[in-house]
From Swiss-Prot:
Organism field: Methylorubrum extorquens (strain CM4 / NCIMB 13688)
PANTHER family per the UniProt record, alphabetical: UPF0235 PROTEIN C15ORF40
Domain of life: Bacteria
Cellular component terms per the entry's GO annotation: cytoplasm
SUPFAM superfamilies per the UniProt record, alphabetical: YggU-like (SSF69786)
Annotated protein name in UniProt: UPF0235 protein Mchl_2407
Pfam families found in the cross-reference section: DUF167 (PF02594)
């Protein structure tokens, strides 16, 4: 069984992300496994990693892709790192279903 890049919490879901900034276009590259064995969602954004532009583009892209408001997607950790943790606010089961559908499974 494949591990998931997210964990459910009482008030939402935490999504592990590996971000590539300054890409040719913003998009989803699927799930990958880091060297530590932890699964992460591989995403790319066109914005550069300057003054939070890539993080803002990341949260906006995730919110739009999952049908959430921007305020429902917050950066928990990884502000200056490529590996990030995002908190998605809402019903955990509904959010998990949306993430699974986004991933194509």
């Amino acid at each position: 069984m494949t591990q998931s890049p997210f964990t459910l919490e009482a008030n939402g879901l935490v999504l592990a992300v590996r971000l590539t900034p300054r890409a040719s276009r913003t998009g989803l590259d699927g799930v990958r496994t880091e060297a530590s064995g932890r699964p992460v969602l591989s995403l790319r954004v066109a914005a550069p990693p300057v003054e939070g532009a890539a993080n803002a583009a990341l949260t906006a892209f995730v919110a739009k892709s999952l049908g959430l408001r921007k305020a429902e997607v917050t950066l928990l950790s990884g502000e200056t790192s490529r590996t990030k943790r995002l908190h998605l606010s809402g019903d955990p089961q509904m959010l998990a279903a949306r993430v699974e559908a986004w991933l194509g499974g």
